[in-house]
Every structure is written in C-alpha cells, then in structure tokens.
C-alpha cells in the first residue's frame, strides 16, 4: 500500500494471471474510491446514490409525498435515495423503478421490468403511480463503442428518449434529471428542453469522478407540450 496526495492509504493490484490492464485499473479505482466504501457502510447498492443525494441537497428536488420514476434503475441506488426522501416505505410517496434488467427489492419501491420505449409504458407507469409523476430521473448510460463521436450521439439519443418519456408522464411543474456527458452534442437537446421547462441547467455533483466528463441535466418547472405547440404555431405564421 502507498499513500495518495490526500494522505489516505492507496491499494494497488498486482498484475498477473489473465487480468487485463483495463480490469486492473478499474479494480484499483473501486478499491480506492471513498464513495464505494461509504456506500457499503451506508447500505447503498452503488456509489451513484451519493450523486443524487448531493444534487438533492443543493436543489431540494425530492420531497415527502412525491411520485418519482427512476429510469434504468438497476442496481437501485437512486431508488433507495428517492424512497427515503419521499417516504415511500410508509406510503407517503411513491417510487416506480423501471429497467430491462432484474433488480432486487427496495422497500417502498415498485419495480417494473420493462422497456420504457414501449408505447404502452407511459400508461402503465401512470397506473402504477395512480397519476402523473413529480420527477422522472435517469442515471442511464448508453453502451459505448470506443468511438468518441458515436458514443456521444448514443448518449444524447438515450437522454432524448428519456425526455420524451418524461414529457408524457410528468405533472405540470415537474422535474427531469438525467445523466449526460460533456460535449457539443447536447446543445440541441438543451434547446428542446428549454421549450418545455422553466429552467434547464447542467450540474456536476462532487461524487462524480473528477476525471469524468459526466454531468447531469436538470430541467425543472415542466410546462407540458403547450409551450412547444404555441412556439410552433408562431413560427408557422
């Protein structure tokens, strides 16, 4: 072991066997990540829980009694945080987690293993919530190819589809929160969202790794499709 620049003991993984360099570096990063260790102590399923916690601490998005949708929810770190914040376990709020993958049970969270792109998904979601959602959030990341431009377009495309889903299930005044990666490719997405939301901004919580281009798009004050329709009508005149 050695100490890093903060004075903490740093774990190194010896090379050997068939472990690839990329796997070795990933394992070292996990072993030396304080958020990973804290997540284990706090009972969270992933370090991502602290990203949502830090964003919520700053912007106060999650309140008791709210209805929340967590897209691409597995393994469930964000759902755990949301359930605690809105009081889902005791019935005050509701959290519906959606993913193609299976997810272990989270107290107070309703899980649906489905594709949110399915045309029937918005209606099914409303039935599970008993109405619209106050917040739609997504920590999803698209599968990468290693080709930077292609990956950026895939990521933005995924967020665009999540935003379209959100526009079908959010209540007026609702919030959309989604992971993006810093690039010029999301400029058009920002423009689109500004038509439907009172405020749109990028935020980067401390729990996001410093060497990562990861950040989050936060859109608040959902106005529905009325603002977009009015703008389109004005442009057509």
UniProtKB/Swiss-Prot annotation:
It catalyses: uridine(2552) in 23S rRNA + S-adenosyl-L-methionine = 2'-O-methyluridine(2552) in 23S rRNA + S-adenosyl-L-homocysteine + H(+). Its main location: cytoplasm. GO terms for cellular component: cytoplasm. Its EC number is 2.1.1.166. The keyword NAD does not apply. It comes from the Bacteria. GO terms for molecular function: rRNA (uridine-2'-O-)-methyltransferase activity. S-adenosyl-L-methionine binds at residues 76, 78, 99, 115, 139. InterPro entries: RNA_methyltr_RlmE, RNA_MeTrfase_FtsJ_dom, rRNA-MeTfrase_E, SAM-dependent_MTases_sf. Keywords: Cytoplasm, Methyltransferase, rRNA processing, S-adenosyl-L-methionine, Transferase. The active site is at residue 179. It is found in: Cytoplasm. It is an enzyme of class 2 (transferase). HAMAP family: RNA_methyltr_E. PANTHER family: RIBOSOMAL RNA METHYLTRANSFERASE, RRNA METHYLTRANSFERASE 2, MITOCHONDRIAL. Belongs to the class I-like SAM-binding methyltransferase superfamily. RNA methyltransferase RlmE family. Specifically methylates the uridine in position 2552 of 23S rRNA at the 2'-O position of the ribose in the fully assembled 50S ribosomal subunit. This is Ribosomal RNA large subunit methyltransferase E. It comes from Rhodopseudomonas palustris (strain TIE-1).
């Amino acid at each position: 072991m050695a100490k890093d620049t903060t004075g903490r003991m740093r774990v190194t993984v010896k090379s050997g066997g068939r472990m690839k360099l990329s796997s070795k570096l990933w394992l070292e990063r996990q072993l030396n990540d304080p958020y990973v260790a804290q997540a284990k102590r706090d009972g969270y399923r992933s370090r991502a829980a602290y990203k949502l916690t830090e964003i919520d601490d700053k912007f106060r998005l999650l309140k008791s009694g709210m209805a929340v949708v967590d897209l691409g929810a597995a393994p469930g770190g964000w759902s755990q945080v949301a359930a605690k914040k809105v009081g889902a376990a005791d019935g005050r709020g509701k959290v519906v987690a959606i993913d193609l993958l299976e997810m272990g049970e989270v107290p107070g969270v309703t899980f649906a293993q489905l594709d949110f792109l399915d045309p029937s998904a918005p209606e099914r979601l409303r039935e599970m919530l008993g109405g619209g959602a106050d917040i739609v959030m997504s920590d999803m990341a698209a599968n990468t190819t290693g080709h930077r431009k292609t990956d950026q377009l895939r990521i933005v495309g995924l967020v665009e589809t999540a935003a379209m889903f959100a526009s079908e299930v959010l209540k007026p005044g609702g919030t959309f929160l989604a992971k993006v990666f810093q690039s010029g490719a999301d400029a058009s997405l920002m423009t689109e969202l500004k038509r439907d939301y009172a405020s749109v901004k990028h935020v980067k919580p401390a729990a996001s790794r410093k060497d990562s281009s990861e950040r989050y798009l936060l859109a608040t004050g959902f106005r529905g499709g009325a603002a977009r329709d009015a703008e389109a009508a004005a442009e057509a005149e």
